[in-house]
């Protein structure tokens, strides 16, 4: 069990140290405004932190609400997390492709649904890659 960092923000060095921990779940929560002409899922498929799963903010929302990105029901959220291999005993680290933009929204959603072991990666993928930390394009086996 990861317990040496109960903070809401984790450093790239902390994540690198714990990258292979079986209790860690890394989420790429990248989402961009339409005018940015970027696609978080496509970027995830090209390059992500090893072991990261993609958290689709558009899909994990209340699809019955006409407003975009409204919080989903607890049932939908829990169902999607189980499908991603995320359970109560996991430490979650969220990042995004801008540094810290949409990852904060994902963090907030976990907190809203009572998950305390969740943190945002300080500097996100830009900082991670600027430090020459590893990336890959392999989708993890969800367990």
Task: Describe every region a protein language model picked out.
Residues 1-143:
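Cytosolic catalytic domains that perform sulfur/thiol-centered chemistry
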């Amino acid at each position: 069990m990861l317990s040496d960092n109960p903070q809401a923000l984790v450093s790239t060095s902390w994540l690198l140290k714990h990258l292979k921990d079986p209790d860690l779940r890394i989420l790429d929560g990248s989402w961009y405004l339409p005018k940015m002409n970027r696609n978080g899922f496509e970027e995830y498929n090209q390059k992500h932190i090893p072991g990261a799963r993609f958290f689709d903010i558009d899909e994990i929302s209340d699809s019955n609400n006409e407003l975009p990105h409204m919080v989903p029901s607890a049932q939908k959220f829990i169902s999607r997390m189980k499908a991603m291999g995320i359970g109560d005993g996991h430490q979650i680290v969220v990042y995004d492709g801008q540094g810290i933009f949409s990852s904060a929204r994902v963090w907030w959603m976990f907190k809203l649904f009572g998950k305390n072991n969740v943190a945002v990666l300080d500097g996100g993928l830009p900082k991670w890659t600027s430090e020459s930390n590893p990336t890959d394009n392999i989708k993890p086996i969800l367990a």
